[in-house]
Amino acid sequence: MRKLSEHAAQHRRGYFTGVIAVTLGLMLLAAAGTIFPGAPLLQPLTIDTDPENMLSEDAPVRVDHDRLKKVFGLDEYVVVGVVNDSHEEGVFNPQDLANIHQLTEAAKGLKFTITVDGEKRQARVVSEDIIAPGEVDNIETSGVGAVDFSYLMPSVPETQDGAIQVRERAQSIPMYQGTLVSGDGKALALYFPITHKKISHAVEQELRQEIAQFEDTGADYHITGLPVAEDRFGAEMFFQMGVSAPLAMLCVFLLLLYFFRNVKLILFSIAAAMIAVVFTMSLLVVSGFTVHIMSSMIPIFIIPIAILDDIHILSDFHDRYTPDRPRLEIIREVMGELWRPMLFTSLTTTAGFASLMLTPNPPVQVFGAFVAIGVLAAWFVTVTLRPAYLMIVSEETLAKFGAARKSKGDGADRPHGALAGGLRAMGGFAGQHGKLVLAGSAVVLALSVWGITKIEVNDNPIRWFESSHEIRVADRVINDHFAGSYMAYLQLQPKDGADAPDQPFKQPEMLRWIAGLQRHLEQNVPQVGKASALPDIIKTVHRELLGSADAFRIPDSPQAVAQTILTYENSHDPDNVWNFTTTDYDQANLWLQLNSGDNKDMESVVQAVDAYMADNPPPMAMQKTWFGLTYINLIWQEKMVNGMAQALLGSFAVVLVLVTVLFRSPSWGLLAMVPLTVTVVTIYGIVGWVGKDYDMPTAVLSSLSLGLAVDYAIHFLARSRQIFARTQSWAKTLPEIYEEPARAITRNIIVLGVGFLPLLASSLVPYQTVGTLISAILVLAGLATLLILPALVGQFPNHLFKKETLNESRTQAPAGGAAAGAGRRR
């Protein structure tokens, strides 16, 4: 790398031209594919925020989900809750019901053209399956043995009494309670099924435009549902990145300006990071990969890593530069000391992110692969273009640059100031009170391990938005008033080889068992607002056939069950039956409305069903299959967490091998892993103690911990060995470490730690999490490096520095490992 940097410094025009040409070329290819979709050999920018794609297309849960949706004729829903707290009857007044009818009619005609797998398709609101007052049946007796089916709201009522009658009809039908009409009888929920989730945000926008035309009646319209949240996140994701990332870069720029006071020099730091980001994201698009939630965060991960190495070079150059020395000579010295730690920190960081390719989640695999590529791109740009740039800046630009020129007196090589003084004090404390530092670290680790045991793995796409966001507000309102906006489905069918009769789900004992399961879930599982199934239709129709409230039960014979279903086929939407069973009655479906989309709540429901079936076996041996978006989210989260744990352990092992090779010593290799271990354990201990859910961004940030913590440790230990090879004394080495090496590390901590706090201004919670945890990781990794490492080295200096210790017969310091000797000045 030394020769590469020197070659770039001497042939700077060629390197600048080459890097810029490649980056612009990729960017133009990415743009051309997007501007001219369908052009041969070009790939357009494709955005995908569907959490389903966190699993591969052939994942069993996805295969079951797609298959069973077709079996039962199910679609995803856009849910609209209508609440009017200013009217004594809520929304059950003529004007609100007229508006609801108008909104329903507008939704029926919504059609959109979408692109799926490169093909244009039509997607629409499934008008025939809308659940709304004017679209569902009122079921009532018209004499013993006869049932009358009419629309619940055949026309918009003109009087208040007519509006009340609509409510009373809805409340008399158990299937509508908590689903269509709220428990207090004052709010309505509308369910608009869509043929593809990709249109959910477009449907939401069209509905909001229609609602905006309504006369103000005091009613509030809340739109939510998992498809809406997922699609809305994609719509806002790039806007937030377009605001948050530049704010972060501005903050980094201002902090670099504070430290180095030279605009022209620090502009390169920003430019190098942007080159790495543009190169990586353009390559991702050109390669045909979609931009998922994960890959949208690639720039946030590359920027700090790209700036890390540049700050090390700039800090070392800053401390060495004087106008009377040849610049190329200074660059040789700087790169001579830094090339090994910079190369190996880049390799270890690359290994950390590349290990994510071992996870079972395709978007995480793509994220890991391209961050790894971005890290290597940032390394190449930094070690070539930074030396080249330092050679071309004018003397006027460097007139006030260089620490030595600002110092006075005997300490000319030791810059003065609060930062330098504080670091020297820290070094002195770590050296003199090493055992105290180690004891304190042990206590922190113990508490952190305890905190890790409190971590709950949990995620919910709705909570990717701030609590004040209209999606979150709608979610709270709808789930407070109704059974729930989160859908999960449970398919039942006899096990292969089971002694099951023909048409098992016409058997009264089987239907009663399902009704018992429904009742158990609604009464004993707080996350289940409502469980709907075939028994609801059968019991309701049976009651109206006999004209008696006591007849709200499952009939006693399969023939009577068949009669109720045949009667229901005279309704306006007889196909509703097939949402709950198949035409040969060999499968059944339970539709669960959950009031929470948290993975841990879905897991509780699954466990409750398992326990019920174990304690109350069905009349015949049954097999069950869960499906629905809420369940899919549970599965991909489980796979991600397990995959992340395996990837972290694997990358930990790879990094350990790399640093052992770097230092040619297992002892130094293990020592370099200490800040990483402390940082990861402490970060996740804090996550556990504060009650933060272990979600997607929290899991992925463990890889960033690995890269940053090892970066600091390698630089600190490599420079320690270089200095010790010259001083032959740990007591003399320690103060020197807390000069330029410690200042470079601290500048990185401050610049990047503070620089990414602007992400907290984002309205999207994953970006807030990334901003908070990146800052915390940087601070903890820096403290672990600057406090714990010197304390540990101070306990075993003779053992650790055996290779660097001079024998009497030697006349010069040996290479002494990978790091020692790398810094001998030329």
What are these regions (language model features)?
Residues 1-46, 387-388, 396, 404-460, ...:
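Signature of alpha-helical transmembrane segments and their immediate interfacial
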Residues 238-289, 358-362, 646-691, 761-765:
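Interfacial segments of transmembrane alpha-helices in multi-pass membrane proteins
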Residues 265-313, 666-718, 757, 787, ...:
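Hydrophobic transmembrane alpha-helices and their membrane-interface caps
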Residues 241, 270, 322-359, 673, ...:
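Pore- and gate-forming transmembrane helices of large, multi-pass membrane proteins
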Residues 421-558:
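Juxtamembrane segments of multi-pass membrane proteins
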Residues 70, 151-263, 274, 515, ...:
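Extracytoplasmic
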Residues 95-181, 194-195, 200-203, 212, ...:
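Alpha-helical transmembrane helix bundles of large polytopic membrane transport and channel proteins
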Residues 286, 303-315, 339-358, 363-410, ...:
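Transmembrane alpha-helices and their membrane-interface boundaries in multi-pass membrane transporters
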